[in-house]
A protein has these predicted regions:
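Short beta-strand/loop segments at the ligand-binding rim of alpha/beta enzyme cores
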Residues: 9-20, 125-131, 143-156, 217-231
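Helix-rich catalytic cores of soluble enzyme domains
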Residues: 94, 98-180, 191-201, 206-209
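N-terminal amphipathic alpha-helix/helix-capping segment at the start of soluble metabolic enzymes
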Residues: 1-33
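Active-site beta->alpha loop and helix N-cap motifs at the rims of alpha/beta catalytic domains
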Residues: 36, 41-140
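C-terminal extensions of enzymes
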Residues: 296-365
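Generic structural signal for well-ordered alpha-helices
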Residues: 76-87, 110-117, 141-144, 165, ...
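Catalytic alpha/beta core domains of metabolic enzymes, predominantly
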Residues: 155, 160-302
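Hydrophobic faces of well-ordered beta-strands that scaffold small-molecule active sites
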Residues: 17-23, 37-41, 92-98, 130-134, ...
């Protein structure tokens, strides 16, 4: 936490939502004077840790033990064991993602998630302490629906639209992670909307608040728990603070942005808006959307100039016929189509680099 007597931006954000760490390095997580809730990851973070010297011995041993079972068995066990290094340093869950290369294959997604479940059990990590990230495509979300029924907790990732969020609700998922910025914006700053008041001005804020308001309504109408909104893909501390004001339940934040948040002294008078303290129950005791953000409910800058003003309907069965309706919606929305493809391409790159590392290791053991 911040130094005594001075509240940091990180301290303030933790009052409004659960702060998670989107990074896997155990030394960094331990060194922070803050116990994060969840530790999230993706194929890039797993690949970085797989190549780290601190895991070399474990990697060799695991490759020897599982030789003959294929690269994925080794990769999956290593990913779980590397998460295990952080389990005592966090309050909540560790998260790992199914193969992005199989995002349109229900059975392969199901198989990989079940393999994670088996490896977590072997490592002594219960289902209350992990969650499996599933790409928000029709086939993968159909796998998530089955996993939810089996009691395996899931998160809908690579999520860019209200339609995807509704599909995740229909799959009974624990969390969703709307990407606040598209993945390419982290490296191509020309794609990043550099605004002074992200909650109000960032082009993705309307979609985030529309998801939150839709989930609040569904909870009220059905009494059924809705996925918790774990906002992700922040480039600046200001964007992370916007997640608090919008009413997100958690924010998973990179180590670089977390360091900045921890060093900034909080001054409410210099903030464009402020979130409320987190409620006891995310939906039962949900706070209303701040008045200044209500205009976001009726706009969608990402939809382009020809948007008809209609939000995705909760009456559509997005998972029927292998997820045909959600795939159709993903294809029809230009922002989702592009950003989903970019995210999967990025993570497939990480997957392929890890596969090469495993195969190189197998050649030596």
């Amino acid at each position: 936490m911040g130094s005594t007597g001075t509240q940091s931006w990180l301290d303030k954000l933790e009052e409004q939502l659960n702060v998670d760490v989107d990074w896997m390095a155990p030394e960094w997580i331990k060194a922070m004077p803050f116990k994060f809730h969840d530790q999230t990851s993706n194929q890039l973070w797993v690949d970085i840790q797989l190549g780290d010297d601190s895991n070399k011995e474990l990697f060799e041993q695991t490759s020897k033990e599982l030789k003959g079972q294929g690269w994925l068995a080794i990769y999956t066990r290593m990913a779980v064991l590397m998460c295990k290094k952080n389990i005592d340093s966090i309050q909540g869950r560790v998260l790992l993602q199914t193969l992005p290369s199989k995002a349109y294959d229900t059975q392969a997604t199901l198989d990989h998630a079940r393999l994670y479940d088996k490896e977590f059990a072997r490592a002594g990590i219960s289902r209350e302490r992990f969650c499996i990230k599933i790409p928000s495509t029709g086939p993968a979300l159909n796998a998530a629906k089955i996993l939810s029924a089996e009691g395996i907790p899931t998160l809908g990732t690579a999520l860019f639209s209200l339609a995807q969020a509704i599909a995740c609700s229909q799959a009974g998922m624990l969390y969703i992670s709307p990407y606040y910025n598209e993945t390419r914006a982290h490296d191509e700053l020309s794609l990043w909307p550099d605004v002074s008041d992200p909650a109000l001005e960032h082009p993705n804020s309307p979609r985030v608040v529309q998801i939150l308001e839709t989930y609040k309504r569904l909870y009220k109408e059905t009494g059924k728990e809705q996925p918790l909104v774990k906002n992700a893909s922040f480039i600046t501390p200001q964007e992370a603070m916007a997640a608090g004001e919008m009413g997100c339940h958690s924010a998973t934040i990179s180590h670089t942005v977390l360091e900045k948040l921890s060093k900034l002294p909080y001054d409410a008078s210099k903030q464009p808006g402020e979130g409320l303290p987190k409620p006891v129950h995310a939906y039962k005791n949900a706070d209303p959307l701040p008045e200044r953000l209500k205009k976001l409910l009726s706009i969608d800058p990402l939809a382009g100039p020809n948007w008809d003003g209609k939000l995705a309907s909760t009456d559509v069965d997005y998972l029927a016929n292998g997820g045909a309706e959600i795939d159709k919606a993903n294809e029809a929305d230009k922002a989702t189509k592009t950003r989903l493809a970019d995210a999967l391409t990025l993570f497939i790159g990480g997957e392929e680099r890890s596969k090469a590392k495993v195969e190189a290791m197998l050649a030596t053991v």
